[in-house]
Each structure stands twice: as structure tokens, then as C-alpha cells.
From Swiss-Prot:
Residue numbers spanned by region G4: 449-452
GO cellular component, one term: cytoplasm
HAMAP family: IF_2_B
Function recorded in the entry: One of the essential components for the initiation of protein synthesis. Protects formylmethionyl-tRNA from spontaneous hydrolysis and promotes its binding to the 30S ribosomal subunits. Also involved in the hydrolysis of GTP during the formation of the 70S ribosomal complex.
Annotated segments matching region G3: 395-398
Gene3D superfamilies named in the record: P-loop containing nucleotide triphosphate hydrolases, Putative DNA-binding domain, N-terminal subdomain of bacterial translation initiation factor IF2, Translation factors, Translation initiation factor IF- 2, domain 3
Annotated organism of origin: Pseudomonas aeruginosa (strain ATCC 15692 / DSM 22644 / CIP 104116 / JCM 14847 / LMG 12228 / 1C / PRS 101 / PAO1)
Comp. bias regions, Basic residues: 233-247
Protein name in the entry: Translation initiation factor IF-2
Region G2, annotated ranges: 374-378
Domain tr-type G: 340-509
Residue numbers binding GTP: 349-356, 395-399, 449-452
Renumbered residue ranges of the record's region G5: 485-487
Molecular-function GO terms, alphabetical: GTP binding; GTPase activity; translation initiation factor activity
């Protein structure tokens, strides 16, 4: 860049040299002669100086004044108006950079001064705390030293001096009390001003009780002989200290709070959110993001709830739903010597086959002679003594209680006596009894009754029961057949001997020294005594005063009665008793357990009551024909259980044969119960226990059965055409099989030429040889009848027009998605996948 002198610059700006030198000197430049060189930065400095001197900085004013004028009109009655003008004026001053810098420096100095003051304050507080600590230690040391000296002095003085030392402190309080009594006499009279002044000064002072409750803060003692009551007297700092002591505050958590979430087998979304201390909507939103749309009351399984809780950053503790039951089972200790117990026998049979007569004869013959004749049976269970031991009988008419016990898993019966009339043969109710006994897995002793009648035919009984898989011992089976006569008493001893022989084979054991455990046979609500339950003690000993847990009920045994209505104090194994004191009537088949205390009994009972509704709802869907696939999906071979009732024997046998023949290696039909006649309450109980469907062929259900079906949600169907039953069962089995995927070939096109398209790549010019070619369907490319590619038909055109389908004998252009290796001579096969239901 060329050098410019002061003289040349004066010529450029058309200014005399002397004036330019004067202006440059005012601008602070060192130039004094016309020959000196002027640099660009010096030119800029001169220009800035000239602008300032000529007033150009006024374009950036340092002070701005704003004026605002507002005019409003007010009405003053009638047509008169008053104009009100409001003027506002504001001035804004722009500070220079030097002022801003000075302000910032002042703020920094003030901040440093404040920090220094805080530091000094903290040091003073620390020094004060150290002084307090040292003073406290010195005081404790002095107190300990004084105590030691006092102990040493007391030990050295004789007993007389000790008496004087004791008497002196006693005398001092007496003198003090005397002075206190005299002081009120010397108190001068107070006027109202004194009282008002005292109230003003003492209204905020804490009382003695308040001072005892709130301990005074530790401070360095001012003087050793000055007593302090913890209240600051005088000074302006007392009020602020009181406020500071009563201050409350909340600190935000510095990090996420991790909670321990207890998750059972099932948990609702609301319960899960409550355990994590978050809103239920947050959990619902989180599960929506996971791809699981749920509601706030929806029940989650354990795995899903565990995943949600862990994703939200909480610890998970898996809890067993039956934890209380497991703890209860562990607390029950059945320790002691096991002894042989009496068998529990249930007598079953058809109504007219002499079951009641046989029971009456056994009771008359085996109960003590002094009690015979006027016996009143209070409960449906009793025990008799024989020469070979004791036998306990359960009277379960209609088999309702027996089926209910089996449904709840309570094996209350050891042996079943099946009473069959020799002159009548095997009847429908006899078949039901056999089905119940086999389902419970207990041995059967057959009593062929009415053997004294001329028309008796025992061989017919054996043939009929052999058809039900009850094989006599003479034929190589395991069921003893005993001919008896309930009228004459013939064969009763042999029957009891056969029962006791079966009991010896079963090796029934019990521990009398253990806490009582049993099962409920029946229960009722007595008007004068409240809930009364008939309990069969199976193990241990039940005593009066024991706390018992029975199903969802509990209570203390206030009284126990035997089968004759006499009060007893305790009952051993295989003894039936009536107990009083429960808080409700338990169901037949509920398990009775003696627990240690009432707290544990109440806790388990409430837990069972909570689960009762869930179990009932789950069981309501168990027997639905439509839900068979979900209910039995875990089994290797799916089974459809059926309880079948028909009007005549021929129809029943035909249906049983046809239904049993259905099925294959994956599914099967099992007729768990069948008979001739209407659907009874016993059939409904059997279907409930066996998870079966009730079928009635030309028969209907009675009131008791309908009540159970409605209460438990069983599936019951009526038919009058035999083929309808077979067709419905086939459909159910087909639904259990699932479905298959089948491929149908829609059409085949042969590639005649290949074109190139910038959009689709290789386009095959084809002739449809078979069927019909559809767009957006899966295809296969075959070369020499070998599949070389499988994909989707992307483009289908005919004469440059997109078409949905092309029939056989027509030409078309085909674009295959993501495939460009099409050659002349290839075949394109278009197919579809169809879901086909499997059939038997």
C-alpha cells in the first residue's frame, strides 16, 4: 500500500495543513510536520475524533425520554362529559462501557466481601462449638470427680456422721417450705397496671411443661453459679431463633428412589403402580409404549409385572401366592408315634336296595346294649366297635357330600360299601356310585343285599358289575362280594370282616399326639347354637378350646358332641364329632386344621376369602365347550370330558360307543359319567369336579342340578337327535386340533421376453398358461422346474395399464419385487396360503 503524508492527506480532504495538524494533535496523534507519514490506523483514529467533535455520536444517544399521553372521557350524568388526560414520562439512560465495567467490579467486590463474611461466621461457629464441647467435657469431668470424692468421704465417715449428713438436707427443705409460707404475707399490693405489664411480658414465654418437653440448646455456660432455664431473656434475637426452630422444609430427592416391589402370581396395574409410588396412568402409558395396551384394573401375570417394574428401575421380589398356606403347613408338626387308625367307610347304593336297613342293623347290633332302642342319630356319621376293631361309617345320601369332598381334593373315605339288591340288579344309581368310587381311587366292597328273597340272583349282580370294571375276587379281581340280609342280619359280620381286611391292606396310620386335622362332612346353621359343623377327625386329636381353621372360616371350639349328642372333651383319629364356635358354616369337604393362635387363623381365613372369588371366576370358564383349547393346551393329549345322561339304556350305550370312538393321537373323548334318567345334582357335582360338559339326550335337569349349573357356570346342553351330539363333539375336537396352512396354486405364467424398466428393473413379458395371475400375491420363480426364488409379485401390466389379474391365454408384463435375474423360459407360479381347519 502507498505511503500517505500529512500534506497529501490535507490535499485529499481539502483542508489546510496547519488545521489538519491541529486536528491530529487534538486526536492524540504524534504528527508535527507535513512530511510525516500517516498510517491507516491513524487515519481511523482521526476520523473517529472528527465525528465526535462534529456531533455524529448523537445518532447513538445516551439518554432517551419517552412520553405517553392517554385521553379518556368520563360521563357525569346526563349529557355532561369530562375529558381526563394522563401523561407518563420515562427516561432511559445508556451507560458507557466504563460505567458497566465499574458496576461489575463493584459487584465482584461485594460478592468477595460476602464470602469472606460467611467464612468468618463459619469459623466463629466452629470455634463456639469447640468451646461448648470443651466446657461440657470439663463440666462432666468435674461432676465425676466430685462424685468420686463424695463417695470416698462417705465411706470414711462413721455412721453417726452419715446420719447427721442425711438429716441436714432434710432440714433444709423444711426451712425453705417455712419461708415460702411466710413470703405471701410480705408481697406488696399489685395494681392493674402491674398485672397488664406482666401479661404483656409473659404471654409469649413458654410454660414449665413446655420447657421440659423442648430441651434447651447447649451453649457455653456464662457462669458456674448461674442457673439457666433455656429461655433467652431480653435481646432482639429471641424471636428469630424461635422462628428458626419451628421452620419446616422439604428437600427434593437428588436421585431416583428405588423401591422393592412385591409381585405375586398375578397383580393389577393399579396395585403395581401403588407399590412403585407412581401414578397408574404412568404405568399404562409405559405398557402402551411396550406394545401392551392395558387398563388400570387389568390383571398382569408375574413375568409381565416383573419386566415393567425392572424397566422402571425398581427392585422386584417375587412372592408366592400361597406363602401363607405354606407357612401354615410348616407350622403344623405331626410328630409322635403313628398308630393304626380305624377305617372310614361310606355306604352307597340305589335308594331301594336296602342301604338304610343295612345301616340300621349294624347300628342296632354293634352299639352298646344300654344305648340300643332309644338312639337318635344327630349327625350323618357314627362309629361302631367290633371284635376286630372300630369302624367309622359316613352316611352320604345322594353322594353330594362325597362328590364335593372329592372335588376339593379331600380323601375323607377309605373304603366304599356298594349295596346292590340281589333281586333288582345293577341300577343307574349303582353305576354312579361305582363312578364316584373309581374317581376317588378307593377300594370297593360289594354287599349283595336281600339274599333271603327267593328271586335273588347273585350271579346277575356279578355280571352287571363286571361290565362296570368291578371284578369279583372269585373271578380274579380285587372286589370282595359278600351276600348279606339286612332283614335277618345274615352276613353282616362277614361284611365288617371284609371291610377290616381291606383296611389292613391299606395300612391306615395316624398320630394321636399331634394337633387335630380332619374334614367337614356337613354343616348347618342351628337356631339356638349358631353354626354347627360335623367334622371327621383324620389325624391327631381335636380338643375342646382348640383354635381351628376350617376353609374360609375359623373359631375356637366351644363345645364338642359325639354322634349320640353327648358332650365330649376330645376326639381322636377316625372319630366324627359336632363342633360349635365357628364364625360361619363351612362347605362339605373343607379341611379342618388346629392352629396355634387366633391371629394366624384370622390371617389365613381372610386370605382364603380373598382368593375364593378368583377361584370361582376361573372355575366358571373351565367347563365351557368353547374354551376347551385354552383349558387343556398344556396337556400332551387333549381330553374332552363328558357327563352323559340318556332316557333309555340303548341310546346311552350307542352314544357311549360312538363318542369313545372319536379322536386320534392328539385328542380324545372321555365319558367320565353316564346313566339313565334325568340330570341330577350328583351329575352336576361330578361334572364340576371332573371339568366336564353335561349332555342330556331326551332328558332334562332337575332343580338342584340347574342351581349348581347356574352357580358354577357349567356348560349343559340338551339333544334329541343322536347325530347332533356326535357332530358337536366332532366340532369341539376339531377346534382342539387347531388349523393347518395350505397352499393353492392360482396360476402359472411362462416368460417369453425380458425388458428393462427404470422403475421396476427387469420386467418379464409372460404368457399366462394356467389359471389366473393376481397382483400382490406371493410367487415362485421356477427354472427347469426347480424353485430358484420365492417372493412377491410387485407389478402386473397389460398394454401399459396396471391390472389386478390376467387370465389364461393372455400376455402380460410381470415385475418381481427385489429380483432382476429373470430369464426367458422361466415359469412364474402365483399361489396363496389358506388356513384350513383340521378334521378328524
Amino acid at each position: 500500500m502507498t505511503q500517505v503524508t500529512v500534506k497529501e492527506l490535507a490535499q485529499v480532504v481539502d483542508t489546510p495543513v496547519e488545521r489538519l495538524l491541529l486536528q491530529m494533535r487534538d486526536a492524540g496523534l504524534p504528527h508535527t510536520s507535513a512530511e510525516q507519514v500517516v498510517t491507516d490506523s491513524e487515519k481511523q483514529a482521526l476520523l473517529t475524533h472528527l465525528k465526535g467533535s462534529h456531533g455524529d455520536r448523537a445518532s447513538e444517544p445516551r439518554k432517551i425520554t419517552l412520553q405517553r399521553k392517554t385521553t379518556t372521557t368520563l360521563k357525569v350524568g346526563g349529557s355532561k362529559t369530562v375529558s381526563v388526560e394522563v401523561r407518563k414520562k420515562k427516561t432511559y439512560v445508556k451507560r458507557s462501557p466504563d460505567e458497566i465495567e465499574a458496576e461489575r467490579q463493584r459487584e465482584l467486590e461485594e460478592q468477595r466481601a460476602a464470602e469472606e463474611a460467611e467464612r468468618l461466621k463459619a469459623e466463629e461457629a466452629a470455634a463456639r462449638q469447640r468451646a461448648e464441647e470443651e466446657a461440657r467435657k470439663a463440666e462432666e469431668a468435674a461432676r465425676a470427680k466430685a462424685a468420686q470424692e463424695a463417695a470416698a468421704t462417705a465411706g470414711a465417715e462413721p455412721a453417726v456422721v452419715a446420719d447427721v449428713a442425711v438429716a441436714e438436707p432434710v432440714a433444709k427443705p423444711a426451712a425453705v417450705e417455712e419461708r415460702k409460707k411466710e413470703e405471701p404475707r410480705r408481697v406488696p399490693k399489685r395494681d392493674e397496671d402491674d398485672d397488664r405489664r406482666d401479661r404483656k411480658h409473659t404471654q409469649h414465654r413458654p410454660s414449665v411443661k413446655e420447657k421440659e418437653k423442648v430441651p434447651a440448646p447447649r451453649v457455653a455456660p456464662r457462669s458456674t453459679d448461674e442457673e439457666s432455664d433455656g429461655y433467652r431473656r431480653g435481646g432482639r434475637g429471641g424471636k428469630s431463633k424461635l422462628k428458626k426452630r419451628n421452620q419446616h422444609g422439604f428437600q427434593n430427592p437428588t436421585g431416583p428412589i428405588v423401591r422393592e416391589v412385591n409381585i405375586g402370581e398375578t397383580i393389577t396395574v393399579a396395585e403395581l403402580a401403588a407399590q412403585m409410588s407412581v401414578k397408574g396412568a404412568e404405568v399404562v402409558k409405559f405398557m402402551f409404549k411396550m406394545g401392551s395396551p392395558v387398563t388400570i384394573n387389568q390383571v398382569l401375570d408375574q413375568e409381565t409385572a416383573q419386566l415393567v417394574a425392572e424397566e422402571l428401575g425398581h427392585k422386584v421380589k417375587l412372592v408366592s401366592e400361597n406363602a401363607l398356606e405354606e407357612q401354615l403347613a410348616e407350622s403344623l408338626k405331626f410328630e409322635g408315634e403313628a398308630v393304626t387308625r380305624a377305617p372310614v367307610v361310606t355306604v352307597m347304593g340305589h335308594v331301594d336296595h336296602g342301604k338304610t336297613s343295612l345301616l340300621d342293623y349294624i347300628r342296632r347290633a354293634k352299639v352298646a346294649a344300654g344305648e340300643a332302642g332309644g338312639i337318635t342319630q344327630h349327625i350323618g356319621a357314627y362309629h361302631v366297635e367290633t371284635e376286630r376293631g372300630m369302624v367309622t361309617f359316613l352316611d352320604t345320601p345322594g353322594h353330594a357330600a362325597f362328590t364335593a369332598m372329592r372335588a376339593r381334593g379331600a380323601q375323607a373315605t377309605d373304603i366304599v360299601i356298594l349295596v346292590v339288591a340281589a333281586d333288582d340288579g345293577v341300577m343307574p344309581q349303582t353305576q354312579e356310585a361305582v363312578q364316584h368310587a373309581k374317581a376317588a381311587g378307593v377300594p370297593i366292597v360289594v354287599a349283595v343285599n336281600k339274599i333271603d328273597k327267593p328271586e335273588a340272583n347273585p350271579d346277575n349282580i356279578k355280571n352287571g358289575l363286571a361290565a362296570l370294571d368291578v371284578i369279583p375276587e372269585e373271578w380274579g379281581g380285587d372286589a370282595p362280594f359278600v351276600p348279606v340280609s339286612a332283614k335277618l342280619g345274615t352276613g353282616v359280620d362277614e361284611l365288617l370282616e371284609a371291610v377290616l381286611l381291606q383296611a389292613e391292606v391299606l395300612e391306615l396310620k395316624a398320630t394321636p399326639s399331634a394337633p387335630g386335622r380332619g374334614v367337614v362332612v356337613e354343616s348347618r346353621l342351628d337356631k339356638g347354637r349358631g353354626p354347627v359343623a360335623t367334622v371327621l377327625v383324620q389325624d391327631g386329636t381335636l380338643r375342646q378350646g382348640d383354635m381351628v381353621l376350617v376353609g374360609i372360616n375359623y373359631g375356637r371350639v366351644r363345645a364338642m358332641l359325639d354322634e349320640n349328642g353327648k358332650p365330649i372333651k376330645e376326639a381322636g383319629p377316625s372319630i366324627p364329632v359336632e363342633i360349635l364356635g365357628l364364625d360361619g358354616t363351612p362347605d362339605a369337604g373343607d379341611e379342618m386344621t388346629v392352629v396355634a393362635d387366633e391371629k394366624k387363623a384370622r390371617e389365613v381365613a381372610l386370605f382364603r376369602q380373598g382368593k375364593f372369588r378368583e377361584v370361582k371366576l376361573a372355575r366358571a370358564h373351565a367347563g365351557k365347550l368353547e374354551n376347551i383349547f385354552e383349558n387343556m393346551g398344556q396337556e400332551e393329549k387333549k381330553t374332552l370330558n363328558i357327563v352323559l345322561k340318556a332316557d333309555v339304556r340303548g341310546s346311552l350305550e350307542a352314544l357311549q360307543g360312538s363318542l369313545s370312538g372319536l379322536g386320534n393321537d392328539e385328542v380324545q373323548v372321555r365319558v367320565v359319567g353316564g346313566g339313565v334318567g334325568g340330570i341330577t345334582e350328583s351329575d352336576a357335582n361330578l361334572a364340576l369336579a371332573s371339568n366336564a360338559v353335561l349332555f342330556g339326550f331326551n332328558v332334562r335337569a332337575d332343580a338342584g342340578a340347574r342351581k349348581i349349573v347356574e352357580a358354577e357356570g357349567l356348560d349343559m346342553r340338551y339333544y334329541n337327535v343322536i347325530y347332533d351330539i356326535i357332530e358337536d363333539v366332532k366340532k369341539a375336537l376339531t377346534g382342539m386340533l387347531g388349523s393347518d396352512l395350505r397352499e393353492n396354486i392360482l396360476g402359472i405364467a411362462e416368460v417369453r421376453d425380458v425388458f428393462r424398466s427404470p422403475k421396476f428393473g427387469a420386467i418379464a413379458g409372460c404368457m399366462v398358461t394356467e389359471g389366473m395371475v393376481h397382483r400382490n400375491r406371493p410367487i415362485r420363480v421356477l427354472r427347469d422346474d426347480v424353485v430358484i426364488f420365492e417372493g412377491e409379485l410387485e407389478s402386473l401390466r397389460r398394454f401399459k395399464d396396471d391390472v389386478a389379474e390376467v387370465r389364461a391365454g393372455m400376455e402380460c408384463g410381470i415385475g418381481v419385487k427385489s429380483y432382476n435375474d429373470v430369464k426367458v423360459g422361466d415359469k412364474i407360479e402365483v399361489f396363496e396360503k389358506v388356513e384350513v381347519a383340521r378334521s378328524l
